[in-house]
From Swiss-Prot:
Coiled coil: none annotated. Its main location: membrane. The chain crosses the membrane at residues 25-45, 53-73, 85-105, 107-127, 148-168, 198-218. This is Ion-translocating oxidoreductase complex subunit E. The lineage of its organism: Bacteria, Pseudomonadati, Pseudomonadota, Gammaproteobacteria, Pseudomonadales.
Length: 241
């Protein structure tokens, strides 16, 4: 697994510039939509946007902490034991995050349940730790985990969860904001389509695959149109020259 996870991030070329860095991680080489990693939580916990956001934030915290630890120890880790040690560090951090959510956000913990522990097997976490954090200083490693790669995974979870929530739960957007923000934020509940009874399939496992398929198809269409626009623009520039 470690060799596959380590090579999962190699296919993305190094972007030049801050905007291209964000664009690459959030869209062009998105962890879930392009590299097709971490699909288990993307399909299992995204029955609501709140669940997707909670899982995304938990993954972001794991990435930030593990990136910092692995980067700080990068000169002390022998290549022979690097992968097992990184997996152990990731497992320890995930355990701490799991216990923290259970203690302070128990309602959210009851929803996410086992899937928090499965962050350990997330190839995106191990692959990023091996390809970037083991070769770079602490601060860039922390920012790398927080800024784009985890954000790209989080927005996919929120979008899939939001679509399934609107279609399957009587078009109510974030019916349980209290899971993340507390009882005082119940007012965030919004009814998007009054009178809509919801589609049961959307909140069932097959619905997760269907929604993911539509999101992937939408991305392919956008990418194709962007490519066609670049080709037309390049052709016009050649003609003008």
């Amino acid at each position: 697994m470690s060799s596959q996870c380590g090579s999962a991030d190699v296919t993305a070329p190094k972007p030049k510039g801050l905007f291209n860095y964000f664009s690459s991680a959030l869209w062009d080489y998105n962890v879930a939509l392009v590299q097709m990693l971490a699909l288990c939580p993307a399909l299992a916990v995204t029955t609501t946007a709140t669940n997707g956001l909670g899982m995304g934030l938990a993954t972001t915290l794991v990435l930030m902490i593990t990136n910092a630890i692995i980067s700080a120890l990068r000169h002390s880790i022998s290549p022979a034991v690097r992968n097992p040690l990184m997996i152990g560090i990731i497992a320890g951090v995930v355990t701490l995050i799991d216990m923290a959510i259970n203690a302070w956000m128990h309602e959210l913990y009851k929803v996410l349940g086992l899937f928090i522990a499965l962050i350990v097997t997330n190839c995106a976490v191990l692959g990023r730790a091996e390809s970037f954090c083991s070769r770079n200083p602490v601060l860039p490693s922390i920012l790398d985990g927080r800024r784009a790669w985890a954000s790209g995974f989080t927005w996919v979870l929120v979008v899939i969860g939001g679509i399934r929530e609107i279609l399957g739960q009587r078009a109510r957007c974030s019916p349980r904001p209290r899971l993340l923000l507390g009882e005082h934020f119940r007012w965030l509940e919004i009814t998007v389509l009054p009178g809509f009874q919801g589609i049961l399939l959307a909140i069932l496992p097959p619905g997760a695959f269907i929604v993911l398929g539509f999101v992937l198809a939408f991305k392919r269409v956008v990418d194709r149109r962007r490519a066609e626009r670049r080709i037309r623009t390049h052709g016009e520039l050649v003609v003008l020259q």
